[in-house]
Amino acid sequence: MLRIADKTFDSHLFTGTGKFASSQLMVEAIRASGSQLVTLAMKRVDLRQHNDAILDPLIAAGVTLLPNTSGAKTAEEAIFAAHLAREALGTNWLKLEIHPDARWLLPDPIETLKAAETLVQQGFVVLPYCGADPVLCKRLEEVGCAAVMPLGAPIGSNQGLETRAMLEIIIQQATVPVVVDAGIGVPSHAAQALEMGADAVLVNTAIAVADDPVNMAKAFRLAVDAGLLARQSGPGSRSHFAHATSPLTGFLEASA
């Protein structure tokens, strides 16, 4: 069971809604993933329509919506988008994203911290997308963020846990949930994140662009469950030396 702020989740896999070929495929994949928390870019929702092709199927699926501020380049823009999301969707939960460079989509640490502090004071449950910077993650935690979402690699790159060493430090020192966000490309990456101590992962591109998104979503669900179970089972420690699994000389001594 994963608890973030006032909500609990059975699934440790969060999913996104972008890049799917259709809204029907998106919903089928989300259901197959078992995800209970789904991110939604406000810039993709047409609030003027009574029947939005993205929003309505998600509401019908019964998932918790996590609107994000993707597209914001400054703290001011993100705060404005956050208030629009709260008014439109009736939720104070927010994935805070501020990335000024459209080529790399790397989060701006200064603007993110500034926006996070303000939004927490304004009553939002803030989950910030951020770089894998242990100092920044601690600062975000200190200003009241409900979780931190450090990247594994650039958004949509499918490179996996390129920031593993920093993620390990973040996980070790965090007192709020750590959700590895961005760069996870295959189910084994998700399993590794849970094994190393992450509380959850957020996956979008790897599922949405797969040849079979529904089965890929199932694969991620199983991988996350496996990674969590492996961690809870207490894996053996790594060693630079070999350790025999059975006696090497006992049978020789017995026959002497």
From Swiss-Prot:
InterPro entries reported for this sequence: Aldolase_TIM, Thiazole_synthase_ThiG, ThiG
Catalytic activity: [ThiS sulfur-carrier protein]-C-terminal-Gly-aminoethanethioate + 2-iminoacetate + 1-deoxy-D-xylulose 5-phosphate = [ThiS sulfur-carrier protein]-C-terminal Gly-Gly + 2-[(2R,5Z)-2-carboxy-4-methylthiazol-5(2H)-ylidene]ethyl phosphate + 2 H2O + H(+)
Similarity remark: Belongs to the ThiG family.
GO biological process: thiamine diphosphate biosynthetic process
Organism annotation: Escherichia fergusonii (strain ATCC 35469 / DSM 13698 / CCUG 18766 / IAM 14443 / JCM 21226 / LMG 7866 / NBRC 102419 / NCTC 12128 / CDC 0568-73)
Name this protein carries in UniProt: Thiazole synthase
Protein's UniProt keywords contain Transferase: yes
GO MF terms held by the record: thiazole synthase activity
Pathway involvement of the protein, from the record: Cofactor biosynthesis; thiamine diphosphate biosynthesis
